[in-house]
Structures are given as C-alpha cells and as structure tokens.
C-alpha cells in the first residue's frame, strides 16, 4: 500500500498541531513554527472557509493515524452505516486498528514504528501472528510481542517513552515485563483527544 515518506514535521506544521509522528524523546516545538505553514516564504492565512476548516480536520486525523484517503473514506462509510454517533464510531474504528493498539500499548514509539512491527510479524493476536496493520481489534483481545522479537531494543525504548510521556489509556491493560497487553474495550469519546473535532469530518463527508 502507498504511504507518505516525506518529512514528518512538515505534516505537523501543515496541520498546525503535533500529530505525534515523532517518537517524543524531544519536544518538536523548537523545530515546528506552528504559526507558519510549511515553506520558506509561507504565511498562514488568518481564516479558512467552512470547507477549508473541515478539510484540514480530515487531513489532520488521516495523518495522525497514518491513513491515506481511500482507506479513510472506507472507515467513514463503515462508521456511517453503523448505529450510533458516526463521528465517535469513526474514531473508535481508527483506535481499534492493530497498529494503533500496538502504539497505545507502548510497543512502538510512533504509529509508523508500530505498523512496522506488525508488518514484520512481530505481533501476536490471540496466539496467532497477524501482519495486517488495519486489522480490527475487538474487545478482550490479547496482544503480545512475538518471543523472537523480544531482543529488539527499540521496543523497550518505546515502552520507556510511553511510561514517561504518554497519558494512560484505561481501555488497554499492559504488562510491560511480558510485552503483553489486553484491549479491554473500545474507548469512549471522552477518553480520546479533545484536539479532534470529528463533527467537522462528518459534515465534510455528508455534503
């Protein structure tokens, strides 16, 4: 599948917020001038149209989870077909992706690194190796690092970063010593980032 391979900080600058695309070892504030868009002579416009605001919100969430347009649109269509709040369901589907759950458990320092762990067959889901990053994790699923991958120092470095810098996620339980965790349930909207306005995304796709 195609993926973005350009500068990650450029994406955060474009969306005017930290998309958590870097490991978090050092703050990106000194590198990212959030009051300016990317480009040597860029000037951030003071006001966007309603469509522009909606589009930027969609782009921000896409880039945060590392998903391209077609796949993101599929997630929206699926969430719209399900009973309940479309925006909240959309975020729950994104949070239930295997690469994101691995990231939330702290086994990868970024979602991109977590996706790599999955694609390299380093992750076991309910006693079976799964190498599909978009695999939808259901409640009460046990996820662990494959024993042959226990010698990867980056996993322990990621766990240390997660323990020091990330907020706790109550829908996930992790045993760092065993490199194992349980996805207990899907998160409630109140437990997810307040920096996401999913209603704008719903408005955009509803046009």
Curated annotation (Swiss-Prot):
For molecular function, the Gene Ontology terms on record are: rRNA binding; structural constituent of ribosome
Instruction: Answer whether the UniProt record assigns the keyword Ribosomal protein to this protein.
Output: yes
GO term, biological process aspect, one:
ribosomal small subunit biogenesis
Q: Which InterPro entries match?
A: Ribosomal_uS4, Ribosomal_uS4_bac-type, Ribosomal_uS4_CS, Ribosomal_uS4_N, S4_RNA-bd, S4_RNA-bd_sf
Gene3D superfamilies reported in the protein's UniProt record: Ribosomal Protein S4 Delta 41, Chain A, domain 1, RNA-binding S4 domain
Q: Which PANTHER family match?
A: 30S 40S RIBOSOMAL PROTEIN (PTHR11831), SMALL RIBOSOMAL SUBUNIT PROTEIN US4M (PTHR11831:SF4)
Q: NCBIfam families this protein is in?
A: PRK05327.1, rpsD_bact
What task does this protein carry out?
One of the primary rRNA binding proteins, it binds directly to 16S rRNA where it nucleates assembly of the body of the 30S subunit. With S5 and S12 plays an important role in translational accuracy.
Task: Give the family, as the similarity comment puts it.
Answer: Belongs to the universal ribosomal protein uS4 family.
The entry describes its oligomerization and partners as: Part of the 30S ribosomal subunit. Contacts protein S5. The interaction surface between S4 and S5 is involved in control of translational fidelity.
What this protein is called in its record is Small ribosomal subunit protein uS4
Which organism encodes this protein?
Answer: Blochmanniella floridana
